[in-house]
Amino acid sequence: MSVRPERNIFYDKVELGLTLTRPADTVQYADNDTIAASTSTAYAIEVANVGAVPGQNVNVVGAYCSSTNPAATPVSLSVWLFNSPPASPVDNAAFAITDGENDTVVGVIPISTWVKSSNNSRGQAHTMKLPLKCAAADTSLYALIVANNAYQPISGEVFKFKFHIERT
């Protein structure tokens, strides 16, 4: 008779969100432009408490975004996640990170499938399990949002992101 050890893996599951409100303008985005909250002040968006402890491994198992814009051509965007805060381009500037910042990228989540209503739209990343790791002394990740298509925003457009995280 052989005995095999039983292996149980338990995950601490959390849902984390962030909100980004665009500037009060309607300047069109080009492919690879940064979507940000300011045209003059650059900063990455902190996604706090991704890890329960510093340096924790996590899996992103779902990513969703809603927008207050019901555009005929919805935005296709990517959420770039870093384990240390990168310098950020301002809104509508070309997305450009340094080689050093590229070394701190822990994942990129494309959100390109959108549905719309007459008042808003919603996108999601499909079937994913993206393993990430927080920095050794941090429980947060830092996000930059990048347009992947030419996109006509509305003034003060609000993007709300939700991330489903499994802490391992």
Q: Where in the sequence are the language-model features?
A:
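Surface-exposed, low-hydrophobicity beta-strand/loop segments enriched in small/polar/acidic residues
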Residues: 2-168
